[in-house]
A protein has these predicted regions:
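CBM-like carbohydrate-recognition segments
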Residues: 120-177
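Aromatic-lined, polymer-binding surfaces characteristic
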Residues: 1-117, 125
């Protein structure tokens, strides 16, 4: 929200906010800003959106470019050619929810990339588009969606019938319409 107020801050206020933002970046974002995440795609563009917020505040186009390149590579790794998402799409009865969660986060990230003028790689767009098709499959034919087996190891999944609730992520507004 501070970015919307930046032009209206006095020099003293701007100095205070800058100091605060730099400290917060150093303490909370910097330690994890480019961690390799091999499984899934989750909140805040899988951790990339805080980098973009900081890059925007500091007008650091190099940081933004590095972030986009890093996160696009991450999307290429965890979004499969067939539209399923590593880890997200294979969480038992929670798979549809986690699939929509990852897809929604990636869609938001791509929207930000386009607003920055970044070129989104064709492979990323193809995999995101396919993931949207898989989400629609999960909504219309859950059995077909869940028939794809995961070739990795799962630690956090639910396969007990009483836990079944086929739904999309509550913050992925209108993703299922």
């Amino acid at each position: 929200i501070a970015i919307y107020l930046k032009d209206y801050l006095s020099d003293k206020e701007l100095k205070t906010v800058n100091k605060y933002i730099k400290k917060m970046h150093k303490k909370f974002i910097k330690p994890e800003e480019f961690l390799e995440k091999e499984k899934g795609f989750y909140a805040m563009g899988n951790g990339g959106i805080p980098n973009l917020a900081y890059a925007h505040w500091t007008n650091n186009k190099k940081l933004a470019a590095k972030e986009f390149n890093f996160r696009f590579k991450n999307i290429e790794e965890v979004f499969y050619d067939d539209g399923y998402i590593n880890n997200n799409s294979f969480r038992g009865f929670r798979a549809l929810w986690y699939h929509s969660y990852g897809l929604n986060s990636a869609l938001g990230y791509i929207y930000l990339a386009k607003n920055w003028g970044a070129k989104v790689p064709e492979l990323v767009m193809n995999r995101i588009t396919k993931a949207a098709e898989v989400l629609n499959l999960g909504i219309t034919d859950y059995e077909s969606f869940s028939s794809r087996k995961y070739d990795g190891k799962q630690k956090n999944n639910q396969y007990k019938k009483h836990n079944a609730r086929k739904h999309t992520h509550q913050e992925a507004l209108a993703i299922d319409t």
